[in-house]
Amino acid sequence: MNKKNREVTSSWFTNLRDLVCAEFEKIEEEYAKAKGLKPGKFVRSSWERDGGGGGVMSVMKGEVFEKVGVNISTVFGEFSKAFRAEIPGAELDGKFFATGISLVAHLKSPLIPAMHFNTRYIETSKNWFGGGGDLTPFYPEEDETAKFHAAFKEACDKYDSGYYPKFKKQCDEYFYLKHRKEPRGVGGIFYDYLNSGNFEQDFSFTQDVGKALLSVYPEIVRNKLFLPWTDEQKEYQLIRRGRYVEFNLLYDRGTKFGLMTDGNVEAILMSLPPEVKWA
């Protein structure tokens, strides 16, 4: 395992966390000031993992963001024997190191899309990056979807013209509810097991994926910040959120990885919306 690689990746995820939290709090302040309300603020709580490592969970419940969670973690140790076969390079001794950031935003307004994003770096006897971002609007708009995809395409095209079509396809396939036979949202990009043989390039790409998210999602939120919405639209949002819950509990790799490595349960389930309905 490479100590320097572990340190620089972990440091970046912490830095990205700070940038995201600052920008989301700024949006809260803009809205609250205009409406004469008290803006939400992130509340942080640290946790430690018995087997090694830990993380920091940042959660904000505000006037714009009904619930947004940003979790960073750096954990290490040994996979259980039952889980080793599922992780590349873990078959022999099961040792691993994993660091990353995960964030999910659920907005009060049903007109503003929910968003999920994560990037991570993992070492076993092998090493790789993974992650991506995806958008879940309740009332999709073509221009908004195109803008979201364009930000990630620009990040991808800097490195390989084949990245975006490949990672978009992987996102569409991954965020699909098989039991419902429907996609979770309008996609984005999703990549895993990325190791081109050039650590610096793969790390730079992963950083640019984070910067792409910061460049586009706050703009999407601000564009609809003051649009009025109805009780019927809110009800529809709550029902559609049920799909989000179903995916995260049935299919999400991050949820499974966290639970199988004795991660913090509250941090792992941080992505679940604060209120949801099933019809």
Swiss-Prot record:
Gene name of the record: hemF
SUPFAM superfamilies (UniProt xref): Coproporphyrinogen III oxidase
Pfam families with a match to the protein in the record: Coprogen_oxidas
Assigned EC number: 1.3.3.3
Region Important for dimerization, residue ranges: 244-279
Superkingdom of this protein's organism: Bacteria
UniProt similarity note: Belongs to the aerobic coproporphyrinogen-III oxidase family.
Enzyme class: oxidoreductase
Assembly mode: Homodimer.
Protein name (Swiss-Prot/TrEMBL): Oxygen-dependent coproporphyrinogen-III oxidase
